[in-house]
């Protein structure tokens, strides 16, 4: 079968991976001061950080609408035997619901809820592409993805809590205390939603090293074909610390460690100073 894999712009895959696997992205919208912008088309994460740092209100995001999905599915379903679309987790956004409504008009379009975001979602996108290259049918690929999504480990540590505070996800007292005490929470995707699972204290570099060590040292069933370091702007050297710590505590080769940048959705909710390590289990 000639299968096309598509995904929401929230998957945080690099331009190189998108080109390698010929992935089509459906962009979410970013709302800034009441005006709508298309994610990574006419607004970038840097635009959002600059806006907030200059005293602007926190930006928000909105799901891809049904009509936008329908246009993409109409074009691609006519050119391919099947289209598999992976959305950001359904508990984070209405994208899955909207994509499912749009896909109802096209019998060869399949929609999968990643139950994840960022490169947690991206892992499954790449997985779908690899399975298609192996010759599996669309139905077989979707079944495999639904089975594998619980094996994705996705988490981040955050240097700044002001974005969470402005978004109502932590109090101003907690945000101030985190800044004064240099506390970096670890936020993980658990059962399709985000939860604080740990916290670290100290410089960002030291917290990154401890965080990566903690999530890898006890894992005995990590897949070694792909791991992501996904981040917003972080202090110089932090990504390299994450990379070296990954190699120290797991047997990843350099070519299987992928560095990617966060999209506007993560930028809106987490801000700069966010770094995550995301992998799959066997």
Language-model region placement:
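Mixed-charge interfacial surface used for oligomerization/domain docking
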Residues: 4, 10-24, 28-31, 35, ...
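Class I S-adenosyl-L-methionine
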Residues: 36-108
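Short beta->alpha junction loops
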Residues: 63, 114-115
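Short active-site oxyanion
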Residues: 1-5, 81
């Amino acid at each position: 079968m000639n299968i096309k894999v598509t995904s929401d712009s929230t998957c945080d895959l690099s331009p190189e991976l998108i080109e390698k696997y010929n992935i089509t992205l459906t962009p979410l919208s970013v709302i800034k001061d009441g005006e709508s912008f298309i994610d990574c088309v006419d607004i970038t994460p840097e635009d959002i950080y600059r806006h907030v740092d200059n005293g602007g209100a926190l930006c928000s995001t909105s799901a891809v609408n049904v009509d936008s999905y329908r246009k993409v599915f109409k074009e691609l379903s006519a050119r391919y035997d099947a289209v598999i679309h992976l959305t950001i987790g359904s508990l984070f956004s209405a994208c899955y619901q909207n994509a499912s409504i749009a896909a109802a008009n096209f019998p060869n379009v399949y929609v999968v809820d990643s139950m994840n975001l960022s490169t947690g979602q991206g892992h499954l996108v790449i997985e779908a592409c690899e399975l298609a290259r192996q010759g599996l049918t669309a139905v077989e690929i979707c079944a495999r993805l639904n089975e594998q999504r619980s094996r994705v480990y996705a988490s981040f540590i955050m240097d700044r809590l002001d974005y969470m505070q402005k978004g109502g996800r932590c109090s101003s007292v907690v945000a101030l205390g985190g800044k004064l005490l240099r506390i970096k929470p670890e936020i993980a995707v658990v059962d399709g939603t985000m939860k604080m699972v740990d916290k670290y204290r100290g410089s960002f570099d030291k917290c990154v090293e401890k965080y990566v060590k903690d999530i890898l040292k006890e894992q005995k069933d990590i897949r070694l074909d792909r791991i992501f370091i996904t981040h917003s702007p972080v202090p110089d050297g932090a990504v390299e610390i994450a990379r070296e710590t990954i190699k120290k505590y797991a047997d990843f080769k350099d070519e299987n460690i992928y560095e990617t940048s966060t999209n506007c959705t993560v930028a809106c909710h987490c801000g700069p100073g966010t770094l995550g390590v995301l992998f799959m289990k066997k």
